[in-house]
Amino acid sequence: MSQLLPSALTEAIDEIGRLPGVGARTAERYAYFLLRADKHLSEKLASAITKLHSGVKSCPITFALIDSSEEVSSLYSDPSRDKKTIAVVEEPLDIIALERTGQFHGTYHVLGGAISPIDGIGPEQLHIPELIDRIKKDEVEEIIIATNASVEGESTAIFLQKHIIDDGIKIKITRLARGIPVGVDLEYASQITLTHALDGRRAF
C-alpha cells in the first residue's frame, strides 16, 4: 500500500502524538497547522523546545524549576519569604497554582512525584531526605503537605508525616483543607478553591 502522507509529516505527527493528552487526530491537526503556518513559527517552536534542557534546571534546595543561570530559586532566596514554613508539593507546576492564590508566603519543596508502587515509585525516589535536612537547617516550624488529593497523594502525605515523627522532629504538620475534590491535581484547582484550602488547612 502506498504511503498516504509525506514521511516528514508522518514523523512530525508521530512525535507530537507522544505528548501527554494528545491523540492521533489531534497530532495530525497540530502537525498540519505547523505545515501551513509561517516557517518562522515552526523554527521558534523548535528553538524553544531545544532550549528546555539547556536553559532550565532544578533548584538544588527546593527542586523548583529555575533558569540555568540561577543558583537557587528566588522563592527561596527572597528575604521576604518565610523560611520557617514549607509547602511540600509533588511537582514544580504545583508551585504556580499555590502562588496564584497570593495567600502563601513561605517556601516550597518539590518531592518530584508521589509514592505509587504500581508505577514503581517508592519513597526513596522522592526528595524526602533533602526535605528533612531543610527542616533541621532552616529550623522550620510548619510543614504544609500540599500533595494532590489522590490515593498516591494521600499515601505520600501519610508517609511524610510518619517519617518526620519517627525522625524525632517536633514540628507542626498540616494538610490542605478538603476544598480540593478527590482526584483533582493541584495545578488544575481554581484559585478560590486553593485559597480556601490554604486558609482551612488542618493539623495532620
Predicted regions and their residues:
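Conserved phosphate-handling catalytic cores of large alpha/beta enzymes
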Residues: 168-178, 182-204
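Acidic beta-strand-to-loop metal/phosphate-binding motif
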Residues: 85-90, 140-152
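Short Gly/Thr/Asp-enriched flexible loops that form oxyanion-binding sites at enzyme active sites
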Residues: 152-167
